[in-house]
């Protein structure tokens, strides 16, 4: 909506900063937007809110209905088509916002903190809907969020920004597995907390590390990370047999990102 003071905004190979106002208006129609606080018109029903962009574009009423009803069905609100926003839950309001954003057949869908105002259960339902839209419509979705669990569940790639500067980017699995920037590490702190050895256990382990084992060998503390198919392979068992080792597992967890275990 606002032109940047410097740099470029390139969408689908086109630099938006070099377009005229008329060209920019046309290009905006190919970009849908989901807002954090829904931004629905209280005087319009579910149908009316979804139909609004099409009415503003001058589409005939019969064509609008042909377009709107399948979208309302897609987001699971067929039974609420004539209800007003005041009669809907937060999750239902967000679904209206999603349907409205899809009404203009966008190539890209921007989701600006779309789940931050929702409860955990509704958040999960909304994320599943967005994944469904991504797969069924082949639509690119750009998620703007500070919730790393949202990134983990729905995104393929991630870009981490700090004070307007990109500090890290890459495949979600790789960034979660090995974050390079301290900002990313801090953001992932909560998500990775379950993988951190408790402080009390660390002190006990330090004592063991300074004490030779029964075979006279020095004890070591090692963190192993398995990604993808390697999570199901008996790596520790093979190492024990091959190198005549004893081992004790202090902490372990299996997580999943985009159907990939790690």
Predicted regions and their residues:
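ABC ATPase "signature
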Residues: 169-170, 178
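Conserved ABC ATPase signature
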Residues: 23, 84-88, 92
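ABC ATPase NBD coupling module
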Residues: 16-32, 56, 61-62, 175-179
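A short, surface-exposed alpha-helical micro-motif characterized by mixed small hydrophobic
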Residues: 151-153
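A short, proline-enriched helix->beta-strand linker immediately N-terminal to the Walker B motif
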Residues: 103-107
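Conserved ABC ATPase "signature" region
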Residues: 14-15, 51, 55-58, 62-79
């Amino acid at each position: 909506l606002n032109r940047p003071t410097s740099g470029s905004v390139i969408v689908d190979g086109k630099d938006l900063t070099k377009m005229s106002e008329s060209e920019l208006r046309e290009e905006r129609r190919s970009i849908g937007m989901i807002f954090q606080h829904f931004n629905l018109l209280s005087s319009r029903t579910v149908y009316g809110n979804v139909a609004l962009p099409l009415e503003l574009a001058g589409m005939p009423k019969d064509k609008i209905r042909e377009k709107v009803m399948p979208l309302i069905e897609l987001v699971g609100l067929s039974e609420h088509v004539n209800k007003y926003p005041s009669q809907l839950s937060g999750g239902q309001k967000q679904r209206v916002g999603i349907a409205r954003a899809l009404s203009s057949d966008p190539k890209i869908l921007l989701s600006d903190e779309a789940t931050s105002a929702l409860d955990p259960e509704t958040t999960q339902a909304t994320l599943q809907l967005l994944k469904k839209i991504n797969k069924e419509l082949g639509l690119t979705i750009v998620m703007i969020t500070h919730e790393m669990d949202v990134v983990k569940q729905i995104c393929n790639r991630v870009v981490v920004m700090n004070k307007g500067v990109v500090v890290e980017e890459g495949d979600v699995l790789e960034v979660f597995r090995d974050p390079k920037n301290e900002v990313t590490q801090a953001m992932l702190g909560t998500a990775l907390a379950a993988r951190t050895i408790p402080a009390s256990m660390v002190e006990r382990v330090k004592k063991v590390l300074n004490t030779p084992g029964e075979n006279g060998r020095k004890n070591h503390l090692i963190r192993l990370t398995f990604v993808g198919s390697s999570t199901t392979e008996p790596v520790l068992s093979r190492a024990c047999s091959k190198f005549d080792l004893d081992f004790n597992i202090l902490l372990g967890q299996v997580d999943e990102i985009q159907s990939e275990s790690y």
